[in-house]
Protein backbone atom coordinates (compact mmCIF):
# COMPACT_ATOMS: atom_id res chain seq x y z
CA UNK A 1 0.00 0.00 0.00
CA UNK A 2 1.33 3.44 -0.96
CA UNK A 3 0.99 6.48 1.27
CA UNK A 4 0.23 9.37 -1.08
CA UNK A 5 -0.23 12.30 1.31
CA UNK A 6 0.61 13.40 4.85
CA UNK A 7 -1.63 15.95 6.56
CA UNK A 8 0.20 17.90 9.26
CA UNK A 9 -1.14 20.04 12.05
CA UNK A 10 0.60 23.39 12.53
CA UNK A 11 1.27 24.77 16.06
CA UNK A 12 2.99 22.17 18.22
CA UNK A 13 3.55 19.83 15.27
CA UNK A 14 5.36 21.68 12.48
CA UNK A 15 5.84 25.16 14.01
CA UNK A 16 5.79 26.79 17.47
CA UNK A 17 7.58 24.19 19.61
CA UNK A 18 5.37 23.44 22.61
CA UNK A 19 2.41 25.34 21.11
CA UNK A 20 2.88 28.40 23.31
CA UNK A 21 1.34 31.14 21.14
CA UNK A 22 -2.29 30.56 22.18
CA UNK A 23 -1.58 29.24 25.68
CA UNK A 24 -0.62 32.50 27.37
CA UNK A 25 -3.45 34.35 25.66
CA UNK A 26 -6.10 31.89 26.88
CA UNK A 27 -4.80 32.32 30.42
CA UNK A 28 -4.65 36.10 30.08
CA UNK A 29 -8.22 36.64 28.89
CA UNK A 30 -9.56 34.79 31.94
CA UNK A 31 -7.12 36.50 34.30
CA UNK A 32 -8.34 39.86 33.01
CA UNK A 33 -11.75 38.90 34.40
CA UNK A 34 -10.45 37.78 37.78
CA UNK A 35 -10.70 34.08 36.92
CA UNK A 36 -7.41 32.20 37.16
CA UNK A 37 -6.96 29.11 35.00
CA UNK A 38 -3.97 26.79 34.93
CA UNK A 39 -1.75 26.03 31.95
CA UNK A 40 -2.98 22.44 32.05
CA UNK A 41 -6.59 23.59 31.83
CA UNK A 42 -5.78 26.05 29.06
CA UNK A 43 -4.11 23.31 27.02
CA UNK A 44 -6.78 20.64 27.43
CA UNK A 45 -8.99 21.67 24.44
CA UNK A 46 -5.98 22.55 22.25
CA UNK A 47 -6.48 21.81 18.57
CA UNK A 48 -10.10 22.96 18.46
CA UNK A 49 -11.24 26.03 16.56
CA UNK A 50 -10.21 28.81 18.91
CA UNK A 51 -13.70 30.08 19.74
CA UNK A 52 -14.68 26.48 20.50
CA UNK A 53 -11.58 26.33 22.72
CA UNK A 54 -12.75 29.37 24.70
CA UNK A 55 -16.21 27.85 24.97
CA UNK A 56 -14.77 24.53 26.16
CA UNK A 57 -12.83 26.33 28.89
CA UNK A 58 -16.03 27.97 30.17
CA UNK A 59 -17.64 24.53 30.33
CA UNK A 60 -14.99 23.02 32.63
CA UNK A 61 -16.55 22.49 36.08
CA UNK A 62 -13.76 24.12 38.10
CA UNK A 63 -13.59 27.16 35.84
CA UNK A 64 -17.39 27.48 35.82
CA UNK A 65 -17.36 27.38 39.61
CA UNK A 66 -14.67 30.05 39.82
CA UNK A 67 -16.52 32.21 37.30
CA UNK A 68 -19.72 31.91 39.34
CA UNK A 69 -17.81 32.86 42.50
CA UNK A 70 -16.47 36.01 40.82
CA UNK A 71 -19.55 37.09 38.86
CA UNK A 72 -22.44 35.49 40.73
CA UNK A 73 -23.55 33.64 37.60
CA UNK A 74 -22.26 31.09 35.12
CA UNK A 75 -20.47 32.23 31.93
CA UNK A 76 -22.76 32.99 29.00
CA UNK A 77 -22.32 32.82 25.23
CA UNK A 78 -21.94 36.60 25.29
CA UNK A 79 -18.99 36.15 27.66
CA UNK A 80 -17.48 33.60 25.26
CA UNK A 81 -17.81 35.99 22.32
CA UNK A 82 -16.33 38.88 24.30
CA UNK A 83 -13.32 36.83 25.44
CA UNK A 84 -12.76 35.45 21.95
CA UNK A 85 -12.62 38.96 20.48
CA UNK A 86 -9.99 39.87 23.07
CA UNK A 87 -8.15 36.59 22.37
CA UNK A 88 -7.97 37.39 18.66
CA UNK A 89 -6.69 40.90 19.23
CA UNK A 90 -3.85 39.74 21.47
CA UNK A 91 -2.98 36.65 19.41
CA UNK A 92 -2.67 38.56 16.15
CA UNK A 93 -0.05 40.80 17.74
CA UNK A 94 2.20 37.88 18.77
CA UNK A 95 1.66 35.24 16.05
CA UNK A 96 4.62 36.28 13.87
CA UNK A 97 6.95 35.26 16.72
CA UNK A 98 5.49 31.75 16.89
CA UNK A 99 5.86 30.43 13.34
CA UNK A 100 9.38 28.99 13.48
CA UNK A 101 9.50 25.45 12.02
CA UNK A 102 10.28 22.77 14.59
CA UNK A 103 13.62 21.01 14.19
CA UNK A 104 13.51 18.20 11.64
CA UNK A 105 10.26 19.26 9.99
CA UNK A 106 11.72 20.81 6.84
CA UNK A 107 14.07 17.87 6.28
CA UNK A 108 11.25 15.34 6.69
CA UNK A 109 8.98 17.26 4.32
CA UNK A 110 11.77 17.37 1.73
CA UNK A 111 12.23 13.62 2.07
CA UNK A 112 8.50 12.89 1.81
CA UNK A 113 8.23 14.96 -1.35
CA UNK A 114 11.18 13.08 -2.83
CA UNK A 115 9.07 9.95 -2.34
CA UNK A 116 6.15 11.48 -4.23
CA UNK A 117 4.14 12.17 -1.07
CA UNK A 118 1.98 15.30 -1.03
CA UNK A 119 1.87 17.59 2.02
CA UNK A 120 -1.43 18.93 3.34
CA UNK A 121 -2.32 20.64 6.59
CA UNK A 122 -5.14 21.40 9.03
CA UNK A 123 -5.29 23.72 12.03
CA UNK A 124 -7.35 25.12 14.86
CA UNK A 125 -6.43 28.65 13.78
CA UNK A 126 -8.73 30.75 11.60
CA UNK A 127 -7.82 31.68 8.02
CA UNK A 128 -6.86 35.19 9.11
CA UNK A 129 -4.53 33.81 11.78
CA UNK A 130 -3.01 31.33 9.35
CA UNK A 131 -2.33 34.07 6.81
CA UNK A 132 0.21 35.32 9.35
CA UNK A 133 1.60 31.95 10.46
CA UNK A 134 1.86 30.47 6.96
CA UNK A 135 3.58 33.58 5.61
CA UNK A 136 6.16 33.58 8.40
CA UNK A 137 6.73 29.82 8.15
CA UNK A 138 7.22 30.07 4.38
CA UNK A 139 9.84 32.76 4.89
CA UNK A 140 11.66 30.26 7.11
CA UNK A 141 11.44 27.39 4.63
CA UNK A 142 8.23 25.51 5.45
CA UNK A 143 5.23 25.53 3.12
CA UNK A 144 2.76 22.64 2.70
CA UNK A 145 1.05 22.02 -0.62
CA UNK A 146 -2.34 22.84 0.84
CA UNK A 147 -3.86 24.38 3.96
CA UNK A 148 -7.40 24.02 5.29
CA UNK A 149 -8.71 26.04 8.23
CA UNK A 150 -11.98 25.54 10.14
CA UNK A 151 -13.34 28.58 8.24
CA UNK A 152 -13.24 26.53 5.04
CA UNK A 153 -15.49 23.69 6.23
CA UNK A 154 -18.74 23.22 8.22
CA UNK A 155 -16.88 22.38 11.46
CA UNK A 156 -13.34 22.01 12.76
CA UNK A 157 -11.85 19.17 14.79
CA UNK A 158 -12.66 16.53 15.77
CA UNK A 159 -14.82 16.43 12.64
CA UNK A 160 -12.98 15.02 9.59
CA UNK A 161 -13.99 17.74 7.12
CA UNK A 162 -10.62 19.52 6.95
CA UNK A 163 -8.92 16.22 6.13
CA UNK A 164 -11.52 15.47 3.45
CA UNK A 165 -10.96 18.92 1.93
CA UNK A 166 -7.22 18.19 1.79
CA UNK A 167 -7.92 14.85 0.13
CA UNK A 168 -10.03 16.50 -2.56
CA UNK A 169 -7.56 19.28 -3.29
CA UNK A 170 -4.57 16.93 -3.28
CA UNK A 171 -6.55 14.38 -5.33
CA UNK A 172 -5.79 11.48 -3.00
CA UNK A 173 -8.18 8.63 -2.13
CA UNK A 174 -9.15 6.38 -0.44
CA UNK A 175 -8.34 7.92 2.94
CA UNK A 176 -6.24 4.91 4.00
CA UNK A 177 -3.57 6.26 1.63
CA UNK A 178 -3.17 9.32 3.84
CA UNK A 179 -1.50 9.92 7.21
CA UNK A 180 -2.57 12.54 9.76
CA UNK A 181 0.18 13.84 12.06
CA UNK A 182 -0.56 16.01 15.08
CA UNK A 183 0.24 16.88 18.68
CA UNK A 184 -3.18 17.02 20.38
CA UNK A 185 -6.03 14.71 21.31
CA UNK A 186 -8.28 16.49 18.80
CA UNK A 187 -5.70 15.78 16.07
CA UNK A 188 -5.89 12.06 16.84
CA UNK A 189 -9.68 12.11 16.74
CA UNK A 190 -9.69 14.11 13.51
CA UNK A 191 -7.43 11.60 11.80
CA UNK A 192 -9.36 8.57 12.99
CA UNK A 193 -12.71 10.11 12.14
CA UNK A 194 -11.39 10.72 8.63
CA UNK A 195 -10.35 7.07 8.25
CA UNK A 196 -6.65 7.92 8.03
CA UNK A 197 -3.53 6.46 9.55
CA UNK A 198 -2.99 8.67 12.58
CA UNK A 199 0.34 9.56 14.22
CA UNK A 200 0.98 11.56 17.39
CA UNK A 201 4.28 13.39 17.94
CA UNK A 202 5.42 13.95 21.54
CA UNK A 203 8.37 16.36 21.71
CA UNK A 204 7.29 19.89 20.88
CA UNK A 205 3.64 18.97 21.39
CA UNK A 206 0.96 20.89 23.22
CA UNK A 207 0.23 17.71 25.15
CA UNK A 208 3.77 17.64 26.58
CA UNK A 209 3.76 21.41 27.03
CA UNK A 210 7.50 21.95 27.44
CA UNK A 211 9.92 24.37 25.81
CA UNK A 212 13.05 23.07 24.09
CA UNK A 213 15.16 24.34 26.99
CA UNK A 214 12.94 22.58 29.52
CA UNK A 215 13.26 19.32 27.58
CA UNK A 216 17.05 19.67 27.40
CA UNK A 217 17.46 20.46 31.09
CA UNK A 218 14.90 18.06 32.56
CA UNK A 219 15.97 14.93 34.41
CA UNK A 220 15.82 12.10 31.86
CA UNK A 221 13.69 9.81 34.02
CA UNK A 222 11.20 12.60 34.74
CA UNK A 223 11.05 13.50 31.05
CA UNK A 224 10.46 9.89 30.01
CA UNK A 225 7.64 9.62 32.55
CA UNK A 226 5.93 12.71 31.16
CA UNK A 227 6.41 11.50 27.59
CA UNK A 228 4.86 8.14 28.48
CA UNK A 229 1.76 9.90 29.81
CA UNK A 230 1.40 11.73 26.49
CA UNK A 231 2.00 8.53 24.54
CA UNK A 232 -0.83 6.81 26.40
CA UNK A 233 -3.18 9.75 25.82
CA UNK A 234 -2.52 9.62 22.08
CA UNK A 235 -3.07 5.86 21.91
CA UNK A 236 -6.27 6.11 23.96
CA UNK A 237 -7.48 8.81 21.57
CA UNK A 238 -6.95 6.65 18.50
CA UNK A 239 -3.35 7.10 17.37
CA UNK A 240 -2.07 4.14 15.35
CA UNK A 241 1.53 5.19 16.04
CA UNK A 242 3.26 7.63 18.39
CA UNK A 243 6.68 9.09 17.63
CA UNK A 244 9.01 11.14 19.80
CA UNK A 245 10.14 13.50 17.03
CA UNK A 246 9.24 14.20 13.42
CA UNK A 247 12.46 12.52 12.30
CA UNK A 248 10.84 9.13 13.02
CA UNK A 249 7.93 9.73 10.62
CA UNK A 250 9.57 8.36 7.43
CA UNK A 251 10.24 5.06 9.20
CA UNK A 252 6.62 4.85 10.36
CA UNK A 253 5.38 5.52 6.82
CA UNK A 254 7.66 2.81 5.45
CA UNK A 255 6.21 0.40 8.00
CA UNK A 256 2.63 1.41 7.14
CA UNK A 257 3.30 0.83 3.45
CA UNK A 258 4.21 -2.78 4.22
CA UNK A 259 0.82 -3.38 5.83
CA UNK A 260 -1.80 -5.23 3.85
CA UNK A 261 -4.80 -4.79 6.15
CA UNK A 262 -7.30 -1.94 5.96
CA UNK A 263 -7.36 0.41 8.94
CA UNK A 264 -10.49 0.62 11.05
From Swiss-Prot:
Keyword Manganese: no
Gene: phnX
Pfam families xref list: HAD_2 (PF13419)
Role: Involved in phosphonate degradation.
Gene Ontology terms for molecular function: magnesium ion binding; phosphoglycolate phosphatase activity; phosphonoacetaldehyde hydrolase activity
Family matches, as NCBIfam families: HAD-SF-IA-v1, phosphonatase
Family: Belongs to the HAD-like hydrolase superfamily. PhnX family.
InterPro entries named in the record: HAD-like_hydrolase_sf, HAD-like_sf, HAD-SF_hydro_IA, HAD_2, HAD_sf, PGP-like_dom2, Phosphonoacetald_hydro
Keyword Transmembrane: no
Textual note on the cofactor: Binds 1 Mg(2+) ion per subunit.
Subunit structure: Homodimer.
Protein name: Phosphonoacetaldehyde hydrolase
Annotated CDD domains: HAD_PHN
Root EC class: hydrolase
EC number: 3.11.1.1
Residue numbers annotated as active site: 9 (nucleophile), 50 (schiff-base intermediate with substrate)
Record field: catalytic activity: phosphonoacetaldehyde + H2O = acetaldehyde + phosphate + H(+)
Cellular compartments per GO CC: cytosol
Cofactor(s) listed: Mg(2+)
Lineage: Bacteria, Bacillati, Bacillota, Bacilli, Bacillales
Biological processes, Gene Ontology terms: DNA repair; organic phosphonate catabolic process
Residues bound to Mg(2+): 9, 11, 183
Keyword terms of this UniProt record: Hydrolase, Magnesium, Metal-binding, Schiff base
Amino acid sequence: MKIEAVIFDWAGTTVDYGCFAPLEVFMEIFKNRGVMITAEEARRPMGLLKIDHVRALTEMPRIRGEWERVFGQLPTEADVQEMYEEFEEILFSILPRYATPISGVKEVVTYLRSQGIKIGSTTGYTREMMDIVAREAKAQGYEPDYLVTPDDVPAGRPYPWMCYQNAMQLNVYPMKHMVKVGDTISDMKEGRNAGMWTVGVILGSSELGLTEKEVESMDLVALQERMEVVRKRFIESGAHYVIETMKELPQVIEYIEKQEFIIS
